[in-house]
């Protein structure tokens, strides 16, 4: 069974997310020293703007941010090299997206398959979405990296997205043509040439490429009725507890008309407020990255 075309287009955007591109300076107001609510609201604003480098710089203390950037390079250097098959597949995808007639060529391939897919799977879509929801719920429950609060929020997200996924016009030819245009436009903005350039990017290049791909994904999902920017714009931060150096807030927002919320504990360091779970996750990842080298060093000592 061939996958639906939307996941295929999203895969293209995922590849493009890794693209190298030019960096730019950010100009944001540091709200983390003002209040816990202002710190969280600024994080949301940075994500909405696609300023992921700015988000990390805002969301982490200076030492941890520098550590994150250094760990990024070490992680990339330690990755297994791409196989010949992987490199060939990525290069072919990028070349196809970069071709002058990319949009027309992809649309010509997509439209017949789209009509066939509607005949084959149109009536089964509610069932397939239901299966997907069940699998997602199980994966969330079994994920050891998520806190109980995060699991509840993720499960609520899946529940909110389910009805939309069942009713979205996935097989509409005009929307599919527009979605292809978004993917091709995103590829041209990123201007990535081959698989090697994906592996050679530094932290700043990666964050900038994430921004381009993120906005491309936003535009594509909006074609099918899922407006991520609208959801982010609706977010408001409600204070719950304030006992420095700790505080607790609730982020409330609307997704597809469904009210959702997520509680967060913040910790104050040097006058700035940071999300406790995010900070601990970054430090845990650093410890795990450093563990093999530390073990090797200890073993070598007499």
Language-model-derived ranges and their functions:
Residues 1-10:
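Bacterial N-terminal signal peptides that target proteins for export
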Residues 17-20:
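C-terminal motif of bacterial Sec signal peptides marking the signal peptidase cleavage site
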Residues 22-24:
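Bacterial signal peptide processing site
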Residues 34-50, 55:
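Short, aromatic-enriched amphipathic alpha-helices that serve as compact interaction elements
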Residues 51-63, 194-200:
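Short, well-ordered alpha-helical segments enriched in acidic and aromatic residues
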Residues 61-83:
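Short, charge-rich amphipathic alpha-helical segments embedded
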Residues 80-98, 221-237:
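A short, amphipathic edge element
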Residues 99-196, 205, 248, 259-292:
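Short beta-strand edge/turn micro-motifs at domain boundaries
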């Amino acid at each position: 069974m061939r996958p639906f075309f939307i996941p295929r287009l999203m895969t293209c955007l995922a590849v493009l997310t890794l693209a190298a591109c030019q960096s730019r300076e950010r100009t944001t107001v540091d709200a983390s020293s003002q209040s816990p609510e202002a710190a969280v609201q600024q994080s949301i604003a940075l994500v909405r703007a696609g300023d992921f480098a700015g988000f990390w710089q805002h969301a982490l203390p200076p030492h941890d941010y520098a550590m994150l950037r250094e760990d990024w390079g070490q992680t990339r250097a330690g990755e297994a090299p791409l196989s010949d098959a992987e490199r060939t597949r990525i290069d072919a995808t990028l070349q196809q997206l970069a071709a002058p007639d990319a949009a027309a060529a992809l649309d010509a391939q997509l439209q017949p398959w789209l009509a066939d897919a509607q005949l084959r799977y149109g009536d089964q879509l509610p069932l397939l979405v239901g299966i997907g929801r069940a699998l997602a719920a199980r994966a969330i429950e079994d994920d050891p990296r998520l806190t109980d609060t995060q699991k509840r929020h993720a499960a609520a997200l899946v529940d909110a997205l389910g009805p939309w996924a069942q009713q979205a016009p996935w097989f509409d030819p005009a929307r599919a043509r527009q979605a292809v245009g978004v993917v091709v436009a995103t590829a041209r903005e990123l201007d990535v040439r081959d698989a090697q350039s994906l592996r050679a990017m530094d932290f700043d290049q990666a964050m900038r490429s994430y921004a381009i791909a993120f906005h491309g994904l936003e535009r594509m999902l909006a074609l099918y009725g899922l407006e991520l920017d609208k959801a982010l714009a609706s977010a408001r931060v409600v204070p719950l507890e304030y006992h420095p150096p700790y505080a607790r807030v609730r982020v409330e927002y609307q997704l597809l008309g469904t009210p959702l919320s997520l509680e967060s504990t913040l910790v104050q360091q040097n006058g700035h407020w940071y999300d406790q779970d995010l900070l601990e996750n970054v430090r845990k990842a650093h410890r795990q990255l450093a563990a093999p080298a530390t073990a090797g060093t200890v073993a070598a000592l007499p």
